[in-house]
C-alpha cells in the first residue's frame, strides 16, 4: 500500500466498542486543500453538519481528521454538536494545530450520545502512535464491516510522482447518493480548491453514488479528500491535462473502494454489476442502473439464482427514466457464460439450467441493452439474504 508524503495515521481501541479498534486519526504535516461530499439524507449527523461548516470556512487549511466508530452521533441534538466540536478541539490540542483545521466523523448506532471521556482518552492515545501505516486507521473506522477497505495508486504529473491512498468503511445502509459509508482520500498532489471540488464530485457520481447494499441512506456518509501538495507538482487547475490524470487516479481508488463495500455487504453472497448500455442519455442510464441494483426483488432473485428477468425490466420501468420498453434486450453473464433472457422487451426461450449455472457464480453481470442511444452507466450491488436480517436484527445488542 502506497502512502502519500506527509500523511500519518493511527487507530486505537478507546472502549466505545467491546473489543475492536474504534478511534482513528489522519494527520498531515502541512495544511491540505480539502473537499467533501456528504449524505443526501435530510437527517444529518452532527459531524456532517460540523464538517460542512468547516469546509466552507477553511477549505485550504485542513490538517487532520478524527473518526470514531460504534456511535454515530446522529439524532443527538445540541449535545451532539457540542461533542463533535469537542472531538475537534481535543484533536487540535493533542496535535498542536488550529481547531478549524480538524474534521470530524462518526459511524455506528444512531441516537446515542458519545462517551466523551473514552473518546478524549482515545484521541490522546492515537496522537501518540501516529505512523506511516494506514492499517490501524482502516481498522478503527469499521462497524459491521468484515474486512478493511484500502486502495492506493501512483501517477506522474509534471514529472512528479503523485500518490493517492483511499481508506473506506461500509457494509450496510448503502444506497446510491452516499450511504453509511465513510471514505477518506489522501494525496500529495498540489491542486486548487476549485479543481479538487470538481474532481471529487465527478468521481463520486460514478463510484459511491452507483452502489447499493440495502436501499437505506445513512445520516453520516461522507467522502473527504485531502491534498497536501508535497509532491511538488505545478498546482493543478480544472480541465487541464494534470487534472484528468489525477482524476483517473482518484477515480480508480474510489471505484475499487466502492466495489469493496458492495463485496462486503451485510450477509452478501454475490456481487452484481449492472451495465446499462446504448441509453438515450447519461441521466437515464444512471437512473436505470441504480434502480436495478436497488431492487429487493432483483437482489433476492440473484440470491436464489433465479433468472427472473421481469424483475429487472420492472425496476428499469420505475426508475424515473423515459425510454421505449419495446427495444430492451437483457442478458445475464458471469464466468460461467452469458445468456439472453429478453429481446425487444419480451421474454425469449432460454435454458433455465444454463441460466442457473450462470447465476451460481459469485459475481453476476446484468446487461441491459436499451438500443436507444450511445450512453452507458455501471452500478454495483449485492444479493439480499437471511444473514442480512440476522445482522441488522441484533445490531444494538
From Swiss-Prot:
InterPro entries: Arg_biosynth_ArgJ (IPR002813), ArgJ-like_dom_sf (IPR016117), ArgJ_beta_C (IPR042195)
Pathway involvement of the protein, from the record: Amino-acid biosynthesis; L-arginine biosynthesis; L-ornithine and N-acetyl-L-glutamate from L-glutamate and N(2)-acetyl-L-ornithine (cyclic): step 1/1; Amino-acid biosynthesis; L-arginine biosynthesis; N(2)-acetyl-L-ornithine from L-glutamate: step 1/4
EC number: 2.3.1.35, 2.3.1.1
Entry keyword annotation includes Acyltransferase: yes
GO molecular function (one): L-glutamate N-acetyltransferase activity
Keyword Thylakoid: no
Subcellular location field: Cytoplasm
Keywords, comma-separated and alphabetical: Acyltransferase, Amino-acid biosynthesis, Arginine biosynthesis, Autocatalytic cleavage, Cytoplasm, Multifunctional enzyme, Transferase
Gene Ontology cellular-component terms listed: cytoplasm
A single GO BP: L-arginine biosynthetic process
Recorded catalytic activity of this chain's protein: N(2)-acetyl-L-ornithine + L-glutamate = N-acetyl-L-glutamate + L-ornithine; L-glutamate + acetyl-CoA = N-acetyl-L-glutamate + CoA + H(+)
HAMAP family documented for this protein: ArgJ (MF_01106)
Described purpose of this protein according to its UniProt entry: Catalyzes two activities which are involved in the cyclic version of arginine biosynthesis: the synthesis of N-acetylglutamate from glutamate and acetyl-CoA as the acetyl donor, and of ornithine by transacetylation between N(2)-acetylornithine and glutamate.
NCBIfam families: ArgJ, PRK05388.1
Record-given protein name: Arginine biosynthesis bifunctional protein ArgJ
Amino acid at each position: 500500500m502506497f502512502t502519500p508524503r506527509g500523511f500519518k495515521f493511527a487507530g486505537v481501541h478507546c472502549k466505545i466498542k467491546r473489543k475492536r479498534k474504534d478511534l482513528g486519526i489522519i494527520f498531515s504535516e502541512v495544511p491540505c486543500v480539502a473537499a467533501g461530499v456528504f449524505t443526501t439524507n435530510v437527517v444529518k449527523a452532527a459531524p456532517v453538519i460540523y464538517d460542512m461548516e468547516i469546509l466552507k470556512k477553511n477549505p485550504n487549511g485542513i490538517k487532520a481528521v478524527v473518526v470514531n466508530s460504534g456511535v454515530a452521533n446522529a439524532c443527538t441534538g445540541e449535545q451532539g454538536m457540542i461533542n463533535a466540536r469537542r472531538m475537534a478541539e481535543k484533536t487540535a490540542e493533542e496535535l498542536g494545530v488550529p481547531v478549524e483545521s480538524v474534521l470530524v466523523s462518526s459511524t455506528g448506532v444512531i441516537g446515542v450520545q458519545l462517551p466523551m471521556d473514552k473518546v478524549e482518552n482515545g484521541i490522546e492515545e492515537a496522537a501518540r502512535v501516529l505512523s506511516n501505516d494506514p492499517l490501524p486507521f482502516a481498522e478503527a473506522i469499521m462497524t459491521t464491516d468484515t474486512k478493511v477497505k484500502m486502495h492506493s495508486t501512483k501517477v506522474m504529473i509534471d514529472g512528479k510522482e503523485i500518490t493517492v491512498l483511499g481508506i473506506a468503511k461500509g457494509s450496510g445502509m448503502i444506497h446510491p447518493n452516499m450511504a453509511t459509508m465513510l471514505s477518506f482520500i489522501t494525496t500529495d498532489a498540489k491542486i486548487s480548491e476549485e479543481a479538487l471540488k470538481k474532481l471529487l464530485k465527478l468521481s463520486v457520481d460514478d463510484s459511491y453514488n452507483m452502489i447499493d447494499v440495502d436501499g437505506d441512506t445513512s445520516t453520516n456518509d461522507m467522502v473527504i479528500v485531502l491534498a497536501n501538495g508535497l509532491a511538488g507538482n505545478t498546482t493543478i487547475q480544472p480541465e487541464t491535462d494534470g487534472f484528468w490524470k489525477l482524476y483517473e487516479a482518484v477515480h480508480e481508488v474510489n471505484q475499487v473502494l466502492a466495489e469493496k463495500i458492495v463485496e462486503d455487504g451485510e450477509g452478501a453472497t454475490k456481487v452484481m454489476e449492472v451495465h446499462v448500455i446504448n441509453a438515450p442519455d447519461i441521466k437515464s442510464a444512471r437512473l436505470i442502473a441504480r434502480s436495478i441494483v436497488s431492487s429487493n426483488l432483483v437482489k433476492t432473485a440473484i440470491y436464489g439464482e433465479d433468472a427472473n428477468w421481469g424483475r429487472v425490466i420492472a425496476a428499469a420501468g420505475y426508475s424515473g427514466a423515459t425510454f421505449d420498453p419495446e427495444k430492451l434486450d437483457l442478458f445475464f453473464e458471469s464466468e460461467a457464460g452469458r445468456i439472453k433472457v429478453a429481446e425487444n422487451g419480451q421474454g425469449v426461450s432460454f435454458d433455465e439450467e444454463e441460466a442457473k449455472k450462470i447465476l451460481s457464480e459469485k459475481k453476476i453481470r446484468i446487461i441491459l441493452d436499451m438500443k436507444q442511444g450511445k450512453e452507458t452507466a455501471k452500478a454495483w450491488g449485492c444479493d439480499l439474504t437471511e444473514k442480512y436480517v440476522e445482522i441488522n436484527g441484533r445490531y444494538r445488542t
